[in-house]
Design a protein with these regions (language model features):
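Von Willebrand factor
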Residues: 1-77, 81-123, 127-129, 154-164
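Surface-exposed acidic, glycine-flexible loop patches that form ligand/cofactor-binding
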Residues: 17-19, 53-56, 109-116, 140
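Loop/turn elements at helix/coil->beta-strand transitions in domains of secreted/extracellular proteins
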Residues: 58-60, 115-118, 144-148
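Active-site-proximal beta-strand/loop segments in catalytic clefts of secreted hydrolases
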Residues: 65-68, 123-125, 151-154, 177-179
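VWA/integrin I-like adhesion module and closely mimicked acidic/polar interface patches used
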Residues: 126-169
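C-terminal "exit" segments of structured domains
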Residues: 170, 174-222
Length: 222
């Protein structure tokens, strides 16, 4: 689709600060409210495949964050093992509640102050907060060179508009999170993981074997 193509194109032109850090830190945040229950397990499986994509490129450390229920917010320890992270994710039970995307963005900024984040992935299907405030937070992340990769499950137009604006303001990218096209979705997540672990040069190499990754070069800020 055009949206997927634009997402893939933007990732490849997102600036990554190069340094001597041994690993890329990727914050993986998910909405774990009741509406996501039916797709949670499949989404977890796809997320775990992100680690495999970075083998031989550079190490990737991932922290899982999610919100659910009545003001519940959780963040895991940083993890470089797909098995450990998948075990943690599979133990999460979705509970009804309002979105708390602002808490995820606040947490991300605090983590970045401790040690730099390379990227943030967010998967959700709703927005019950003030979009203007979230866009302001996204803009702050953009100043810090921490791009947001916003994945939307479902097709709510208001949610889509807000997610797109947040991605743009942070210097990141937006894409539908379509579990009916698991292969395509895997390629999208893989491209973000490779970007976080090895930067643009690693992503460029991936484009030679992954058509979706090849398209991930135009949506992000240059």
């Amino acid at each position: 689709s055009t949206e997927v193509s634009q997402f893939l194109e933007k990732v490849a032109i997102t600036p990554v600060q190069q340094d001597a850090e041994p690993e890329g830190r990727l914050l993986f945040a998910m909405d774990a409210t009741a509406s996501r229950e039916t797709t949670w397990d499949r989404a977890c499986h796809l997320q775990g495949q992100m680690f495999q994509a970075t083998e031989g490129i550079g190490s990737l450390a991932v922290q899982l964050c999610y919100y659910r229920g009545f003001s519940e917010f959780h963040s895991s320890a940083w993890c470089s093992s797909a098995k450990i992270l998948l075990r943690e994710m599979s133990g999460v039970k979705c509970l009804g509640g309002h979105t708390q995307i602002n808490r995820i963005l606040d947490h991300a900024m605090k983590e970045h102050k401790t040690k730099r984040l390379k990227a943030i992935v967010f998967v959700g299907d709703a927005l019950e907060e003030t979009a203007d405030h979230l866009c302001h937070q996204a803009g702050q992340l953009g100043v810090l060179n921490v791009p947001l990769f916003m994945f939307q499950e479902g097709s709510n137009p208001k949610v889509k508009s807000a997610y797109q604006q947040m991605a743009q303001l942070s210097g990141g990218a937006y894409s539908p999170f379509n579990l009916q096209s698991a292969g395509e979705l895997k390629d999208l997540l893989t491209a973000v993981a490779v970007f976080a672990a090895g930067g643009k040069s690693a992503l460029k190499k991936l484009t030679t074997i992954s058509p979706p990754a090849a398209l991930l070069t135009q949506q992000l800020k240059g």
